[in-house]
């Protein structure tokens, strides 16, 4: 792994730490000013701009108390891909649920310039791959 790839992975890890804490300074230190975060069409429109995205994650933390864990992460050049687990609390049930997904990051000058998020919510149950042995493979579990 090259030094720039290792740096890019550390930036993504710091971004996830910022999502976990809701700390605007940490989040902004990882984002390009013109970052775009894309979601699946059934979820949200793209979020554009570092300030907007950082404030989004701060609010998300305050409302749903998510805790992300990066399960796998790889880098190639200026792109990083992570597979993650997130336990969170939907407003309707107040019960902790597990959400799993992947994100593709495009980096620019050791900052996140683009995020493509692949996951779906299930407010009434866990959003996981059916039958996948998460615990046996060392993934975060509830």
Residue ranges of each PLM-predicted region?
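Short N-terminal signal/transit or membrane-insertion segments
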Residues: 12, 36-47, 135, 140-142
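Short acidic-aromatic low-complexity motifs
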Residues: 2-33
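A beta-strand edge to alpha-helix "cap/lid" segment located at domain peripheries
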Residues: 2-7, 20, 55-142
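A solvent-exposed, acidic/Ser-Thr-rich amphipathic alpha-helical stretch
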Residues: 25-77
């Amino acid at each position: 792994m090259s030094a720039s790839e290792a740096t890019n992975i550390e930036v993504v890890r710091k971004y996830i730490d910022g999502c976990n804490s809701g700390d605007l300074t940490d989040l902004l230190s990882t984002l390009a000013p013109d970052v775009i975060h894309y979601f699946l069409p059934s979820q949200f429109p793209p979020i554009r701009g570092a300030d907007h995205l950082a404030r989004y994650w701060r609010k998300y933390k305050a409302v749903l108390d998510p805790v992300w864990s990066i399960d796998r992460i790889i880098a190639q050049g200026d792109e990083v891909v992570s597979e993650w687990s997130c336990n969170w609390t939907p407003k309707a049930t107040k019960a902790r649920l597990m959400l799993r997904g992947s994100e593709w990051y495009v980096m620019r000058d050791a900052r996140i310039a683009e995020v493509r998020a692949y996951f779906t919510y299930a407010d009434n149950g866990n959003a996981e791959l059916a039958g996948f042995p998460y615990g046996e493979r060392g993934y975060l579990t509830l």
